[in-house]
Each structure stands twice: as structure tokens, then as C-alpha cells.
Amino acid sequence: GVFETLKHWKLFGICALGIVYLWQVSRYLHEYYVHYPQTYPAAWEYGFKELVSYVNSVQDRYPKIWVTDKHDQPYILFLFYSKYPPQNFQGQHELSFRDKFNFSTVRDYGKFHFASSPWDRVRDMHNMLIVAAPEDIPAVGVNIVKTINFPNGQPAFKIVSN
């Protein structure tokens, strides 16, 4: 009778909800791991591992290295990927003034300086390695030694030897 019919509909409903749930979870995971990194690569901190590797390989040639802070707080990623000794960092870093949200960030440690790097601000600084966002560096008249790209092929960083 009626109860048998309700049992079948209940089972059907549970199975249907399970299928919808599995579909949505798989769709979410696909969007998160396939599309999101291609659409918003900066949010995944892409490029920093390669950037730090390159900068570490040439840092002995420069007394100062200027790194853009356009993508998050790069000092954390530089410390992590370069395996910088914590005891050295703790004794020599400089914090910025607190912003309107009462946050500060690291502006300097060792030979590294982290700040925005529009070309008019850094172009006259010589004997320095400059890591900038691509839109901050002019297309001509600049000694771009390396470009680091996001996975989607767009430039993430331009590295200039000044």
C-alpha cells in the first residue's frame, strides 16, 4: 500500500540527493583545482617558487633587491622558499607602519626591500635587482633579465637589472 510506495519514494529521494551531492562536490573540486588556478593564478601564489630560486641564484651580484608587494606579502614566500634562517630574520627585519586596519608588514630584511615598484620610483636606482609586476615596467629601454609567467602564460613578474 501507501507505506510501501512512500518507502520507495524515500529511497529514490535519498539516492537522488546523494547523486546531486556527489555531482556538486565533484564540480566544486574541478572548478577549484582546474579553473580557479588558471583564472586567478596570483591568488595561488604562482610564480614565487621560480622567482625566489632565480633571485637566490643571482643575489650575490646585487647589494639591494627590490621586490614588488603587489601580489600579497612576498617576504613570507621569500623566507619560505629560500629557507632563510628564522634567527637571522627575527633580528634584522623592519616593519611598516600600521595601516587603517592596524596591520603592518615586513618592508626590509637583509638585502631585500618589499614595496610597490612603479617604474618612476625605481628607474634611477642603480646596481639593484628589481622584481616588479609586468604593468609597472615599460616595454622598451629596460634591461629585463627574466620574466616569470603564471600557468596561463600571462607574465607574473618582470625582473630588471638596473
What is the meaning of each model-derived region?
Residues 1-16:
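Membrane-interface junctions at the ends of membrane-embedded or membrane-associated helices
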Residues 4-7, 56-60:
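Residue-level signal for alpha-helix termini/capping positions
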Residues 13-59, 70-82, 86, 90-116, ...:
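Membrane-proximal, lumen/periplasm-facing interface regions of secretory-pathway glyco-
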Residues 58-70, 113, 126-132:
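Short hydrophobic beta-strand segments
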Residues 92-162:
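Aromatic/acidic, Gly/Pro-rich catalytic loop(s) in extracytoplasmic/lumenal soluble domains
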